């Protein structure tokens, strides 16, 4: 299996193979997930001080905050998958 990487903004890159969900941070359950991850030292803040617009949840229970829209991250995820299938 080849490693696929997704740019989540400001030069930060995440392994696409480890992503479970890309969600918006506005709902109360997602805010609780962020708080729990912060308490467990499993939160990665990749916003560079900007407003959090996307929350990426990984299979290792790490939570990554990004300053770009969830739709943008999802589109990059899909493009990455399509690019790999074209190469094979």
UniProtKB/Swiss-Prot annotation:
Pfam families: RemA-like (PF04025). PANTHER family: REGULATORY PROTEIN SSL2874-RELATED, REGULATORY PROTEIN TM_1690-RELATED. Belongs to the RemA family. This is Putative regulatory protein asr0105. It comes from Nostoc sp. (strain PCC 7120 / SAG 25.82 / UTEX 2576).
């Amino acid at each position: 299996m080849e490693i696929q990487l997704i740019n989540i903004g400001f030069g930060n890159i995440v392994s696409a193979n480890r992503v479970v969900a890309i969600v918006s941070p506005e709902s109360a359950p997602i805010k609780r997930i962020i708080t729990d991850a912060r308490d467990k030292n499993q939160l990665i803040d990749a916003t560079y001080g900007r407003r959090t617009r996307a929350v990426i949840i990984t299979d290792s229970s790490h939570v990554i905050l990004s300053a770009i829209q969830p739709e943008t991250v999802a589109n990059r995820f899909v493009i990455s998958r399509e690019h790999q299938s074209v190469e094979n």
